């Protein structure tokens, strides 16, 4: 059953939930990568990660069954998903950027602003996603992959759309759009978001912290 969402965060929560439609495509990105020149040492873990994405999609679907969906947000999320699928960057790179700089921002948002059901599911997913990002980071490093400027622009467009309903310079930082946009930028470029230190998603390796030699 639905619980109480944080006042002022409702529309953004529905947009963030709509991004669940990217869970399975991220799994497909990884599956596609397994058919290419992925290091054998990473294959077993990557295959496990794909199974996790299916579980995440199912768990988030339970949440939407309880609290409902915003049909406009759902439609826009499908359009964003299509843009991610069509983007030419390597599939494992798309998975890494989506998980680290989008999912790692949405999950703390859920934990600060969602009801008890959303908070529980997001905590469970966060544990898996940390393993996914660490694994994908190492694979991208081993393959010498770095995100293109256009993939970064797609990341920015996605995160901006999710948090667009929030205000700016609000007294509650968790209702401040810039707080979350900055978190995404820092996770993307620095691999850490100190402002998310209350969560387990505050520190992941940045692209430049892995040697591509």
What kind of feature is each model-predicted range?
Residues 1-213:
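Non-heme di-metal
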């Amino acid at each position: 059953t639905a619980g109480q969402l944080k006042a002022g965060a409702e529309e953004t929560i529905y947009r963030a939930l709509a991004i669940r439609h990217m869970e399975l495509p991220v799994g497909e990105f990884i599956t596609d990568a397994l058919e290419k020149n992925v290091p054998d040492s990473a294959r077993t873990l990557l295959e496990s990660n794909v199974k996790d994405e299916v579980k995440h999609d199912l768990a988030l679907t339970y949440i939407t069954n309880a609290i409902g969906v915003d049909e406009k947000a759902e439609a826009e999320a499908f359009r964003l998903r299509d843009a991610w699928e069509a983007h030419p960057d390597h599939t494992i790179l798309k998975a890494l950027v989506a998980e680290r700089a989008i999912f790692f921002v949405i999950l703390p948002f859920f934990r600060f602003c969602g009801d008890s059901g959303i908070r529980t599911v997001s905590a469970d997913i966060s544990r898996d996603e940390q393993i996914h990002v660490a694994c994908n980071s190492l694979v991208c490093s081993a393959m010498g992959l770095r995100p293109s400027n256009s993939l970064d622009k797609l990341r920015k467009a996605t995160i901006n759309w999710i948090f667009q309903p929030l205000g700016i310079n609000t007294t509650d930082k968790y209702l401040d759009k810039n707080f979350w946009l900055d978190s995404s930028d820092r996770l993307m470029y620095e691999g850490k978001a100190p402002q998310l230190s209350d969560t387990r998603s505050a520190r992941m390796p940045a692209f430049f912290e892995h040697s591509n030699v």
